[in-house]
A protein has these predicted regions:
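Hydrophobic structural segments
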Residues: 1-159
Length: 159
């Protein structure tokens, strides 16, 4: 299930966090809008460097990478939240790496075997940026209200 914000905001926000250029919709839903974005990374880098870049941009302690760490990547697809359903559209778009969350073992291995790397930042790893974005929007639209946010917490523990 996707929300209106998934179609009209989340992917653009995430693509902006990665400084993607020449962006396009990954999977069109309606009238040129849709889920995910593709684009050019700010520079060509190794997959390992891209993983570090994603960690830094989204303030993450770790990411899971499928693919050869020394592979050079220049283009990316980003699909915040669960990205398993975006594997085929990303592959068909011909990008070097899919950046998403909730990529299962077999999908990640299959994509890497097909030549497309995957960076799994976790379901909430990318989507947590929604909170601050929505807070700013509400503060602008409703200046008389004090907008408070809850701290971001993963719904599980990694030990």
């Amino acid at each position: 299930m996707h929300t209106n914000y998934d179609v009209l905001g989340m992917a653009d926000l995430a693509a902006g966090m990665l400084d993607l250029t020449e962006t396009e919709v990954l999977e069109e839903v309606l009238d040129g809008e849709g889920i995910g974005r593709t684009g050019r990374l700010p520079k060509i880098m190794t997959l390992e460097e891209c993983g570090q870049f994603v960690k830094e941009r989204f303030s993450l302690p770790n990411v899971k990478i499928f693919g050869e760490l020394n592979k050079m990547v220049a283009t990316a697809a980003i699909s915040p939240g669960s990205g398993k359903s975006m594997a085929r559209p990303a592959f068909e778009a011909g990008v070097d790496v899919l950046i998403s969350g909730d990529i299962d073992h077999h999908t990640g291995i299959d994509m890497a075997d097909c030549g497309m790397a995957v960076i799994d930042a976790g379901h909430y790893g990318i989507e947590h940026i929604y909170i601050e974005d929505m807070k700013k929007f509400l503060e602008k639209e409703l200046p008389a209200l004090k907008i408070c946010t809850a701290p971001v917490r993963q719904p599980f523990q990694v030990i």
